Amino acid sequence: MELEERGLQLLDVAELEEPQRGLRVLEWLRHLRRVLPVITRAEIKENQKQLVEQLLLVMMGFPGPPARRLLAYNMAFVYSSGDTFSVYETIDRCNDVIRSKDDSPSYLPSKLAAVACLGALYQKLGRLLGSTFSDTVSNLLKVLRSAESQGRSEIMLSLERILKGLGSAAIPCHRDIYKAARSCLTDRSMSVRCSAAQCLLALQKEASFMWGSDLESLASICFKAFEGSSYEVRLAVARLLGKVLARAMQGATSPRQNARKLSLQEVLGLLSTGFLRGNSGFLRGGGDMLGGTSVTTRHVRLGATQAYIVFIRTLGGHWLARNVPVLLSHSLELISNPKAIQNPTDAACSRCCISYILRATVGELLGEKAQLEAAREICEVIRKLMKTVDAVLSDSNLETRFCTTDISASQHVLVCALQELGDLFLGLGTILAPLLKDSSAGVLDTVLSVSLHPSLSARLAAAWCLRSVIVSLPSLAAPVLDRCVERLTALKSSPEAVSGYSLTAAVLLGSIRLCPLGVPHGKGKVVMSLAKDLLCTASQNSRFSLQRTQAGWLLIASLMTLGPAVVQSQLGCLLLLWRSVFPVTPKDLDTERRRGDAFTWQVTLEGRAGALGAMRSFVSHCGELMSEEVLQRLLPPLPCAIALLTLLPSLQKLYGNSLKACSVLYRQRLYQLLVLLPPKTYEESFCAVMKELVADLTSPDYSPGGAAFLLSSVCHPDDLVLLGPSFQECDQRATEEELLLSSGIPGGSLEYDLHAIYELPSEGESVPKPLPSAFTVIQAASLLFGTLLAHMPESQRPQILQQLVESIKQTKGSRQQSVQLCAMSSLCNFLKHLASSRSNLGPEEMRKPCLSLIQAVLEGNSLWLRCAGVESVARLVQVVDDPTFTAGLIQASFDKLKTARDVVARTSHSLVLGTLHRYLGGINSSQHLASCVGVLHSLSQDTTSPEVQTWALHSLSVITDLSGPLFNVHIEATLSLLLTALITTSPSHPEVHRSLGRCLSALVTALGPELQGNGAVLSSQRTSCLLACSVMQENPDCLVQAQGISCLQQLHMYAPKHVNLSSLVPTLCVHLYSPHLPLRRAVLACLRQLAQREAAEVSEHAMTVAKEGHEDLKMEMNMRELGLEGVLLSLLDRESDQQLLRDVKETLLHMQNCTGLSRLSFWLRMLKDILSASADFAAVASVDTNQEDEGEVACSDSVLTSSKAESLGSSVTPHWKTRIFAMECVCQLITQCELDGGAHFDMAQAQEMKHKEPERDFLVLHLQDLIRMSFMAATDHSEQLRLVGLQALLLVIHRFAAVPEPEFPGHLILEQFQANVLAAVRPAFNTDTPPDVTARACEVCSAWLASGVVKELADLQRVQQLLLTSLRRVQVAKETASVYSESTTAMESLAVLKAWAEVYIAAMEKQVTQSKMAEAQNEVLLSLVQAELLTLSGLWLAALQDHALLTLPAACASQLPSQGGGFYTAETSDAARPHYLLSWAPILHASSLWLSSSGFVLPDQDEGNGHLSRPVTPTSMGQERGSQLPADSPEDLNLERFHLILGISVEFLCCPPVDAPMERITSCLRALKALLSGMWPKAHIGTDQDLAIELISVLHRLLLMRESSEVQLLVLEVGRLIVNAAQDHVRERRRSAEVDDGAEEKETLPVFGEGHDTGGLVPGHSLVVAALELCLCILIRQLPQLSPHLSGGSVVGKTEPLFSEARLLVASSLGILAELPSLCSPEGSVSVLPTLLYLVVGVLQDTTVKFPDGHLTLPVTAALQALKVIVSSPMSQVEKCRASWTRLMQSAVSTLLNSWHLERQLVPDSVSLLTALTIFLLSANPEVMSDPGLQNACVQRFQNSIDSKNPTEQLKCYRLLLSIFKHPVPEVVAPYVCSLAPRIMRHLSQAESRKPQSMEELLVLQEGVNLLKTLVSAVEEQNRPSMVCMLLHLLISFLLDENALGSAPHYSRALHDFGLHSLTSFGASYPTQFRKLMGSSPALRSRLEAALRGNQESLKPKAPSRGTMGGGHGSPSIQLKTNFL
């Protein structure tokens, strides 16, 4: 079906036939729209004639609405790009079609298409069409009179386009068009009204009379248009009226427009006439006085409200900021006008409208500074009004006092003002602090003064406003609560004061859970005491007994929101209060009933309702305290409470209506409580409660129109769309709900339920809006009915349901509908409860009453009832779970649908088919499914009834969604049906289009990933889906457009390649600023998904749209400058919908993740502009003058705000929440760069790479911006932003601290920003700063000090002084009163101690690791800490003790100190735990360092008794502070401190939480390492073997759980310290025994150590085994081939080089293994030796690899060192185990010898293996290597190396032999000398014929001579002459004569010099042999003389080079080389 898009394609329309004609035409028209803008004009002209002919054929072919729009666009584009010669013929043709007398429905589409074409032609060509427009306009206006609704709407839209195209040229027709549009503005068709409003909006741009002489009449007709209007009409007409009024006030823009300019007061007066307007018409007006304001009036009021907002938004934020007082005054005058508040319903609607006006203008258009001023203005209004009220109320003259009407008016004004003030406070957050501190404004006093207002509504509004203050500024919670308590106590005799201040206190208590810093724990006790006092004194005076009773229980109920921690201590008192408020026995209740009067019963019922409300609050908020015991103590009042429930009807009959309200409230509270309690707890009262429930449900006190409050519990959320668009989310939801619920419900309000004031509002609401008790009691009753009926005996259930059936039969009309809805709600709740508990309905007789209830509503007239009935049918089938029953119901619906012709039956039964699928998980029968789909298909094509179509399509969408693969056979037919309906259905039926959209969405889901397929069928289906989406996107209804975007989003998810982003992204950009919330939500959800995959492409397409200037792209932000990212950021300040805001943020984060690195400058600049938009630049300049470029400072106006002045509708500056998000984005960018690595954190490299590749960017180049942004955020007025700013600063310090400054070597790049950092953190240490900000600042300070950036003492001291200030606060924290919770004090104290700990750790670690150059700086840092170390150490230990106590299991709770710990109180222990969790690890490490460095030496006794050195120490654990303790010995203190540190460490390391950060684990291990480095702990753990074993076991477990190499290395270091401690202990015991027993018994000494006499090492009781397991764990993990099991049986597997971390781990493990024999007894050493030798030799075999330069790897070096330690162990010398050691070592040698023959991947290093053999030769017992076989094998290995061609190997072999030849035991050396010396001599003698060619060869010869010299000195005297002679011969052979010396190569000359030098020294040592040799060999003598002569000659010109003279010793150069490598 898809047309080729390579060029212009023509279509022969005449040849097309149905049914494919419509689709083919639509596709061709879409193809033209895409192609025409991109092809050349010449090509268009070439094909113009054919194109026009085909388009005219389409016009005459009865096109549907989508084709009509495309046809008009293409026709206009062809003429605008081609020739215009034939356009007049086309216009005439269109006019002829319009004038046609054919009025048949089939010809109507052609007429509508002609009208559309005319409009498009005139809009595109404009004045080119000359004067033809007058004929066209008159023709259209003439036809308009007789046109039907679609025609009238299309003509209005066409006239709008004509006006836009012609501009001022159409002035002659303006009046005619105006008259026609005015009449259409009140058309009965809503779509015509919308079109007329659009037409007039276009007209007003040129027709000055509209906002001049005709303004009043236009306003009047607009108000009339609002009557009976829809939501869309109200928006359109309000937009017209608001724009016209704004134009009227702004005045004429051109000289010819001479209309009078209106004043603001005149405009507001015009708008107010509509707002206050009653019903138009004489007869309808009378109803207002009798029955209240009608719905029609409310329509007008809603429209006027929207017009107010459009008017103000058109004038813009700057205008509003100047005119806030006027707007406030006018708005509040409106609400005080008697016409606006004629009755409660009217007043509620008016209040809602005024609040909406203020919120949409003051709340959205103003920046933060302007909002602060607006808040000040509102406060002034409130103050003046309260002064008036106070003055009048205090006036004793009754005639001049306020009448009731005046009080009512003032209350509504106050409610609106206070609500807006509260919303402003919530939006401003902590920024409003300066306003609240301003005494001249007196905000708090003003708001609190309203608490004494006579009206309850005003008092509630004041309370809620104060709640907003507290949520914004938590520091005021405690002070304001104190003020309320004080006023309550002082003014208990004033009913208004008791009510007002108790409400305020209750709302404050309810808001404390939103304040993370809380309030002091004692406030709960104070409030509880006050509440008890109010309840106890309530009966003293009847004048205020009701208020005191209400206030007491309200305070108790709100107290429950503080949670179990506060309530637990008051629980006993609460239970007594609850018990005392109800009679104890039924007899007491009966006695009560006989006494009292109406007022007494009113107070009693209010009190008991309050008690029940407090119980409900307790159960809701303190569930943790609901133990079985508490539940049993809570239940006794219930039977009497239920008994009183049954008495209420008789009491009401007795005392009249005065008890009605409180009895309804009592019922409501009791029902709500019973719903929360387990039904079994009141089982004996089931019947009594059920009787009352049925009575309530069958006599509801509301009109049926107000039943919407029950819909959420009855209908499925997906089905609510069938009830109308009012149930959809929209920006005007609050006001629209007031209209929706107007029939019988006066809107939700706090005065209907005082207990709602301490609850949280629903999402999207700023204030809770409980419904009146008459409605709430029905809600609670229906919920409780469902629960109780499910728990009642099955035999009683049918009777109860039958009662409902009978009750319905006994009522009629609207009353019957109310009862039916109550019954359906109850039945639905019952069925839901059964389904959730997986219970069955029960016996068959239950079905009859259920079906009776359902059948009665399924065919009723009420939409709501039908929806409820359908839902109940499905749920009934679900719980019956009987296929026969289900089939019968389905068949009954089929039959009904076949026979019934009425709309009601067809809608309800069609929906039944869908909902049955929903609750049965799809009907798994293809036959059933085919029948359902067939029926619904036919109903969906019933064009005579849009309602039937809507319901049938909705049901079809449900079936499609739930049928799974069974639906696949119906996809093609359903798609065809959808497309046909979309093409043909009129836009005037948007509900049908919405159902089509839901159906398409379900189809796309059903197709799923198959949409990616390439088959013909799938390709066709995919094309159909895309076509349907495009049609929906062009629908005028916003919900349909949103569905189209959502469907495209689904298609993109399943088949991303087939969704064209170049067309989708522009559409999304156009709708970003749509006035419709659902559309914006769909756009952002789609963008979020696109950004996850194709962020860069989306950004590019958006920028293309901005640059090309899309005609529909109208937004305040300049996308061309800011890109899509900047526009999205601006939305954060415009939007209030939480879901939409989340989508915006996620989209931005995805885009940043994708493009952040490639567009780093763009992101940083944009984020910086947001942060700069409202920053204090003076503050920035004060610390940054040297670092800020003047040009940059001058450009402080950001790109986000620079273009604001250019547009009237200017945007506000970014709010604090937006700035917080921007700062979080900065932090994420830093993290991104960190993950990317590279040059982002290296200035020199970044500058170099930037020079080479200018397009690349690096973070380090923007460091100045990062610091600046962090500073701006950290010093902002918003506390939340300060937190994020400090976090960003911390991140910058961590990432850039080590970056050097390339321009100044030896300096760091951050040094230049010291002033900025200090200025950023200093404000956080002010006394009025919240503790969380101070805690974060402490973290920054510690990181800054520890970073090493600060080097000067003065700079260090400035930062240290800040920490010192906090430390002083910590010391007196317990004695200082705080406005925050005690846990917050603990948080701040621990943060300070943690900061000091981190600085101390850094100073101590640098002392060990830094170079000498940095020692001076480090000493300064350490000295700063040392000065406070005595104080800090005591506080650190106290904090650690607290942490140890708080980590005890719950079973040990009784052992915790009753007064709490050093930094927490017992009541806030749960809240303090997280703070300890964050801080304990660094404190533990610092404490360990301090203890180990001081050697566990205590301070002097005088100091020890001081307050600071031992505030809380382990010796006082669990003791009260006041008790006097005897001084413990230093040993005891040391022991307890040691166990405190060790206990915390072991407890954590035993099983660290999965989410525990790695830093916490490493800190803990470092603490252990530091602790065990001290002498005292080392000695202690050495003596306690069980403790050492346990600690090693814990470390072993940690190794198994953590793969981090850092952790593993630390574990091994700690393990080594433990082994060393045990080693020292064993050594000390042996030394002591040696001293005690004397030398004569030395053979008995080595019995110390593990293994004793038996040699047995028991796992779990052996430190050696534990350490062995620890090391084995590491070795096997790094070298699996060590384990035969892991390596598949072979001892040696693959040998692969290890990484550096692995090498360190292996080396460290071997170091521990080598020490293990020293821990054993001789017998024990024999037990462990085989394993040790196996592991060490195995490591040697597996890691030794030959390198070209001959260097050894770390594991090899460590293995050789370990081998030496083991082989030379004293245990090998002990007689009783010497033989065993010898055998085992011989086995090891044998294994080593076999290493030469193993098959390996890498060539083994012979030198390493020879070194190992040499170690055995030199260090082991002589008998180990005395075995002839081993000797021969060893000799053979040395011979091989001597003969090696590798000089490096030869050299090292010679050196090894040198150490062997020096061995003092001749028996060891002899075999090697005999075998190897001749071979060495032969090798050296070859030098005469083959001179050395390299330094290595030269060194080999030199080393060989040294070896022979050693032999000469070691040989016996009688054999020495011959050896000397041989050596002299050899040395002389090295010499060159005088002829050869001059031309000799360098190395030959070096050998000559070496020989000559050696001869000199050696000859002097053996002169006799030398003279004898010279005398007997003239040849040698002459050679020597020639060499000497030549040498003399060479000395003359230059001094001899000493480069090789030292070669005789050889070692220095080689040693240097080895060390270097």
UniProtKB/Swiss-Prot annotation:
Gene3D superfamilies: Leucine-rich Repeat Variant. HEAT repeats lie at residues 795-836, 1059-1096. Residues 1512-1522 have a biased composition (Polar residues). Keywords: Repeat. Belongs to the HEATR5 family. This is HEAT repeat-containing protein 5A. It comes from the Eukaryota. Residues 1503-1528, 1989-2012 are annotated as: Disordered. The gene is heatr5a. Signal peptide: none annotated. Coiled coil: none annotated. The keyword Cell inner membrane does not apply.
